[in-house]
Amino acid sequence: MDIEKRLDLVKRQPTEEIVLLDELRKIFETVNRPRHYIGLEISGKLHLGSLILTGYKINDFLNAQVECNVFLADWHTYINNKLDRDWEKIKEVSEYYSEAFKFFCPGVNVIMGSSMYDTSNEYWKDFVKFSKHMTLSRTMRALTIMGRTKKENLDFSQLLYPSMQSVDIRTLDLDIVHAGLDQRKIHMLVREIFPKLGWKVPVSVHHHLLPGLSEPSKLGLTEDSTQDSSISSKMSKSQPSSSITIHDNESAILNKINKGYCPVGISQNNPILEIIRYVIFHEFSEFEIERDSKYGGNIAYIDPSELETDYQGKKIHPMDLKNATSRYVNKIIDPIRKHFSRWSIIDDL
């Protein structure tokens, strides 16, 4: 595969930013199979954002002949008070995450954080070296990577999180670091501090954050108003009514989407239209809306922008849009839903 085709795969939606594209081009010119990673905390049920959209981007990397690694950050999970800090539960849910990504992204490697720490002799030395370049105020500003604000009552271990995530990247010897836009701060920190230590600086690729089905919100997680809305509104397993999990049946998907925020004639920050653009159009070349003939009959789109324009012009009714979205989402989720139909751990999440 030539370099331009590989670059096009990386640039493809849901990618929103590459830091920097010229550096990525050079990597493809000089490294036969670049090494990628995306790090994930282990918590509740995987959903349309955390597995499907993320998995689509991982598959783009795999198709671009990149070695892809999913880093399951079990110690970060513990530090961030997920899964009640129960190590047995963290281990069980890690197995579920591992199976899900291996099923949805054939060829991906899964790395456990605790295993890496156990086998790396240099990790904690590098942690101290990196942290010597971090001020307390800079650490506090970076806490949005774990969904925390400076105003929260934090324990000391949570202040270790930004340095740990950065040194994970160093220890894994990566060419490409990949995450949602909510992790941008840590990648910019890496770009600033790694050169001071003489460490390899990886390219950062940030993908779109799929919003939950509720009305957009702003929690003050970052100074940038647009980014704050994107991060605050992202689909989250902590808000099950606003999140479409990979285990939801057809009825649950329809019910959740029908209750979703989708104001008439408003295309901006519309979660239904975002699901269509970033999830459905990634897999389907055409999006068909079924309508009674008295309302104009069925209509099909091959371009999400054209659909958004028609919706803004009130040519499409919200319920018609939602019904079509539910139908396509169910098709996408069905194979992995069936794959996990006998996994009892899911019932406890």
Name every feature range the model reports, one short phrase each:
Residues 48, 119-126, 213-218:
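Short, solvent-exposed polar/charged micro-motifs at secondary-structure junctions
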Residues 166, 184-349:
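Conserved nucleotide- and phosphate/pyrophosphate-binding catalytic cores
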Residues 1-19:
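Short glycine- and acidic-rich boundary segments immediately preceding or forming the N-terminal edge
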Residues 80, 86-206:
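Divalent-metal (Mg2+/Mn2+/Ca2+)-assisted nucleotide/phosphate chemistry catalytic cores
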Residues 41-43, 75, 115, 209-212:
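Active-site beta-loop-alpha junctions enriched in small/polar residues
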Residues 15-20, 111, 244-246:
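Short acidic-hydrophobic, aromatic-tinged amphipathic segments that line or gate anion-handling sites
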Residues 47, 101, 232:
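Divalent metal-coordination and catalytic microenvironments
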Residues 14-81, 177-190:
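N-terminal catalytic cores of NTP/NDP-binding nucleotidyl/phosphoryl-transfer enzymes
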